[in-house]
Swiss-Prot record:
Pfam families: FliD_C, FliD_N. The gene is fliD. This is Flagellar hook-associated protein 2. InterPro entries: FliD, FliD_C, FliD_N. It comes from the Bacteria. Residues 264-277, 344-358 have a biased composition (Polar residues). It comes from Treponema pallidum (strain Nichols). GO terms for cellular component: bacterial-type flagellum filament cap; bacterial-type flagellum hook; periplasmic flagellum.
Length: 722
């Protein structure tokens, strides 16, 4: 009995036997699980093909839909530092000239230095920006707390900041964030008291400087020094009445009205112009009427040129009188004008020489004068800043207005008479300040509110903002700085947008073709040819390689894609048929020797140079090649992009071919997974049964072993007694 043994049964040996038996039982289950993985790979492959097909459909549909790139426009600026242009697809193709003279800006006023412990008293502080009012109820406190309170209330309209003007000095800067003349910054209530206290503003004075007359003879020039430098930021305007007169009359008036330094003009005939002194002590001469006694009247028309407004005087039908001419002496034989007493030390100085004898003869013979004069402003550095030349005729005075802010800081006016037959005379010269809001002007303006001013196709235009959307339909013009000369802006078709859209179409097409090639073939070289794949994408594509090998649906789709991209289509009004190869797109766009296996797989190539030239020369034909209306019903019904869209539509969507195929695979996956679950339950039950049987067998063997041992012990004891 002790020799009775069952192979594989004993101390744990039955486990190996059970596993061996269960391994054979698991074969059907493992086969079903392997099918699930195959189905999952196939389903992922179908979904990838569907995704790339949808990307291609979206790309080609965009080539003929209402937002197709062939209607896109791009705007060009010849000086992007000075101005930039943005155009929408609604803008028309056009070209314009532009010269920026002023940039719209807002007021920015700087205060005098204030101490570190400066406190702002309590009160209602009202800041006005145009018609907008910003009220701050202040209980009093340190100026930095006041800054925070103003900025919180001002938001995007008013900014108050602290400026360190030096290491130990600080000042307040009041800045308006709104631009344009209509958005001037002013102060009311307690804000006005604070502005006056800190010398942010002061009471305005209308005329900064006045002068009766300045006259220069033929071939000579004169200089008029201002009592103090005129700052560009002060918003000043120089005005005068210019006229061309006979040489003898002008020479006498030049002598009579030349002012002495620091005083009023003197006259050899006792005609002294009255003078008033401003607060700075500089002489301010009140304008007088012209020599013939006729007052300067409002102009009937004007011309604006390079920042200067030239205004015509009112027309007069009467012949000029000779009253008062007898007081002017005749020109001497040498043509030299007698110098008025004190002229060499006066504010207005005359230089140069020229003969006027012939000129007087010309005047007597023709009875009329016509000519031009050169004007210039002198900068603080001594540079001459030319003004547009004056073109005048005799007895036709013109009023001229020059905004000084366009010329920077200046200190003098220079007059050069290039006319050889008459004298150039400026009367009623004055420098005035612009209308000040509330009767106050800034003391230290960092900038002053002004409109943007520019010449657009020769027409003077102003706007209160630098972003102009209402000048050209569909175009936004953004001004950045002044231009030194006339620049150009243009709106043209956006060829790059068209080309990029076509390149995107080709890329999406090739990606779909590559995916079909990968899943329907088991050649790893297909993946190796795709250099644009990332390592992760290559790993994924390797898993899907050949997963749908020989799939007739995908092979048919591939064939139809190739045929649609190689077919000819009628494109354009000329009725000519064109293919993608005509614009540089084909399976062999670049000439090469030998056979390229990649070209045999149906991938498209692009000759960018040919495509670019086609878009430039035949944009409408290229557009029609991708999609056009062939029957006049205003609906696109032909073209490469249209036919590809129609081809792909049945494959996509919830009820499309890919969705149906994918749903079928999902059902197989579910049914197979259920079979796997059933196998797992059966195998678990089978393993329990085997373990129960072998445990029972093992118990029986152990019982028999014990009985055998008992018998042996009994026999041994019997033998021992004998």
């Amino acid at each position: 009995m002790s020799d009775v043994r069952i192979p594989g049964v004993g101390a744990g040996k039955y486990d190996n036997l059970i596993q061996s038996l269960m391994k054979k039982e698991r074969i059907p289950r493992d086969n079903a699980a392997a099918k699930v993985k195959v189905y999952e790979v196939q389903n992922n492959a179908l979904k990838d093909v569907e995704r790339y097909a949808r990307d291609l459909r979206d790309a080609v549909k965009g080539l003929y839909s209402f937002n197709n790139p062939f209607a896109e426009k791009e705007a060009h600026s010849s000086n992007e530092r000075a101005f930039t242009v943005d155009a929408t697809r609604d803008a028309a193709e056009q070209n314009h000239t532009l010269r920026v003279k002023d940039i719209a800006q807002g007021d920015a006023f700087l205060s005098d230095p204030l101490p570190e412990d400066f406190r702002v008293p309590s009160g209602t502080y009202t800041f006005c920006i145009g018609e907008k009012k910003i009220c701050v109820s202040w209980k009093g406190g340190h100026y930095r707390d006041f800054i925070r309170a103003v900025n919180k209330q001002g938001k995007d309209s008013l900014t108050l900041s602290e400026i360190k003007t030096s290491g130990a000095s600080r000042a307040l800067l009041f800045r308006s964030e709104l631009t344009g003349k209509s958005s001037r910054l002013s102060f009311e209530d307690a804000a006005l008291d604070l502005a006056l206290r800190l010398r942010v503003v002061q009471e305005a004075r209308s005329d900064v400087f006045t002068q009766d007359v300045l006259s220069v003879g033929p071939g000579k020039h004169a200089r008029l020094d201002f009592p103090h430098p005129l700052r560009a930021q002060a918003g000043l305007t120089l005005e005068f009445v210019a006229s061309l007169e006979g040489a003898s009359i002008a020479n006498e008036e030049s002598r009579a009205h030349t002012p002495a330094q620091g005083g009023a003009p003197t006259s050899s005939h006792g005609n002294t112009a009255s003078a008033a002194h401003n607060q700075d002590g500089a002489a301010a001469v009140r304008p007088t009427e012209p020599a013939n006694g006729a007052p300067v009247q409002e102009e009937t028309s004007s011309v604006f040129f390079e920042g200067v407004t030239v205004k015509n005087e009112a027309s007069q039908g009467d012949l000029p009188t000779t009253d008062g001419l007898e007081k002017y002496p005749a020109v001497d034989d040498k043509g030299d004008n007698p110098r008025a007493p004190g002229e060499s030390q006066g504010t207005a100085t005359h230089e140069g020489s020229g003969s006027s004898t012939d000129n007087a003869d010309d005047t007597r013979s023709t009875g009329a004068l016509a000519g031009s004069g050169k004007l210039a402003l002198e900068s603080l550095q001594g540079h001459a800043l030319p003004l547009p030349p004056l073109v005048l005729t005799q007895n036709a005075p013109q009023m001229v207005s020059i905004p000084l802010r366009e010329y920077g800081d200046v200190r003098a006016l220079i007059l050069d008479n290039a006319q050889a037959r008459g004298a150039l005379t400026l009367r009623a010269i004055r420098v005035r300040a612009e209308d000040a809001p509330g009767g106050y002007v800034p003391v230290n303006p960092a900038s002053q509110a002004q409109d943007a001013a520019f010449d657009f196709d020769g027409v003077h235009v102003t706007r209160g903002t630098n972003s102009i959307t209402d000048l050209i339909p569909g175009v936004t013009l953004s001004l950045h700085e002044r231009t030194e000369k006339t620049e150009t802006l243009s709106v043209t078709p956006d060829v790059n947008a068209m080309k990029n859209a076509i390149i995107e179409f080709v890329a999406k097409y090739n990606r779909l073709m590559a995916e079909i090639n990968i899943v329907t073939s088991n050649k790893s070289a297909i993946i190796d040819e795709l250099a644009y794949l990332t390592p992760e994408e290559k790993k994924k594509e390797t898993e899907q390689l050949g997963s749908l090998h020989g799939d007739s649906t995908l092979l048919m789709l591939k064939d139809r894609l190739r045929r649609n991209t190689s077919n000819a289509y009628r494109a354009g009004d000329d009725g000519a048929s064109r293919t993608l190869a005509h614009i540089g797109i084909s399976t062999k766009a670049h000439a090469s020797s030998g056979i390229n296996t990649a070209q045999l797989r149906g991938y498209l190539e692009i000759d960018e140079e040919k495509l670019h030239s086609s878009l430039n020369a035949q944009k409408d034909q290229v557009r029609a090649l991708f999609g056009h209306d062939s029957d006049g019903d205003l609906l696109v019904d032909n073209g490469v992009a249209f036919t590809l869209t129609e081809l792909l539509n049945p494959y996509l969507g919830r009820s499309g071919i890919f969705a149906i195929r994918s749903n079928g695979v999902d059902e197989r996956i579910k049914s197979t997974e259920k079979r796997v679950e059933t196998y797992d339950k059966q195998l678990e039950k089978k393993e329990r049964e085997l373990r129960h049987k072998y445990h029972t067998m093992d118990g029986a063997l152990r019982s028999l072993q014990k009985q055998s041992d008992a018998i042996q012990n009994f026999n041994q004891s019997v033998r021992n007694r004998n």
